[in-house]
């Protein structure tokens, strides 16, 4: 049964103060979110106006700053292009808040899957350890990583702007190819679903081997052809740190949006979000990090053994 509106509103209020939910609340939240996300599409249609956001990576106070700059949810419609967890100190609170907002305002918020929304990656880059530290077990990690399998892979704003975390795939020429994928699974090591979450644009033409070890690099010729074939004006993606928070490339066929300022608390970059207005007009809002909070104790407590 869906949670009462009052319950979810109370949870959102609590999360806005960076106070984590109980394990039971997370379990119920994820179960409800699954019932919403399972009905969404691999290419989820989105109407304008909408504000498009890139990586957040557990930088909770910078997410609050994003909402301050861009407008609160649900007053502003948002589309997040993945990578909510890992690296920052507050992955639990960050992903909990975004999922709670999705459950409360399902038509006002679109949350896509990033390459970090995966069991394997989160065990290496911090989310798993954070869940153990904050809850004393891995149950919350399991609830969220099971939910991640349901996240849409891409979104399409007014049939014109194609949004996704990473980039294109040599296996996928059309949006219909993407629509036919079975997405409800762990991110594979290779293949089209992996490519959408891992690939990057590149200055060289054609397809290239990615230095990331997953996905591909794709040239301007590839992006131009993909946009032409599918009647698109723009590919909007995240996945790469860009110092100004946004970066046009490939003759403005592709834009990278990155929304974690001073990434990893040391990169010195600005963050940005992309406002797409009623008439599909585009406006970038840049922002600096929120004032530093007291960092939590992040020493890794290694359990005596792993079950």
Swiss-Prot record:
GO terms for cellular component: cytosol; peroxisome. The keyword Transcription does not apply. Mn(2+) 2 binds at residues 83, 115, 165, 239. Mn(2+) 1 binds at residues 55, 57, 83. Binds 2 manganese ions per subunit. It comes from the Eukaryota. Induction: Induced by salt stress. It catalyses: O-phospho-L-seryl-[protein] + H2O = L-seryl-[protein] + phosphate; O-phospho-L-threonyl-[protein] + H2O = L-threonyl-[protein] + phosphate. Its cofactor is Mn(2+). GO terms for biological process: regulation of auxin polar transport. One of its GO terms (molecular function) is metal ion binding. PROSITE patterns: SER_THR_PHOSPHATASE. Pfam families: Metallophos (PF00149). Keywords: Cytoplasm, Hydrolase, Manganese, Metal-binding, Methylation, Peroxisome, Phosphoprotein, Protein phosphatase, Stress response, Ubl conjugation. Belongs to the PPP phosphatase family. PP-2A subfamily. Associates with the serine/threonine-protein phosphatase PP2A regulatory subunits A and B' to positively regulates beta-oxidation of fatty acids and protoauxins in peroxisomes by dephosphorylating peroxisomal beta-oxidation-related proteins. Involved in the positive regulation of salt stress responses. May function by increasing chloride channel activities on vacuolar membranes. PP2A consists of a common heterodimeric core enzyme, composed of a 36 kDa catalytic subunit (subunit C) and a 65 kDa constant regulatory subunit (subunit A), that associates with a variety of regulatory subunits such as subunits B (the R2/B/PR55/B55, R3/B''/PR72/PR130/PR59 and R5/B'/B56 families). Also interacts with CHIP and TAF12B. Interacts with B'THETA. Interacts with CLC-A, CLC-B, CLC-C and CLC-G. This is Serine/threonine-protein phosphatase PP2A-5 catalytic subunit.
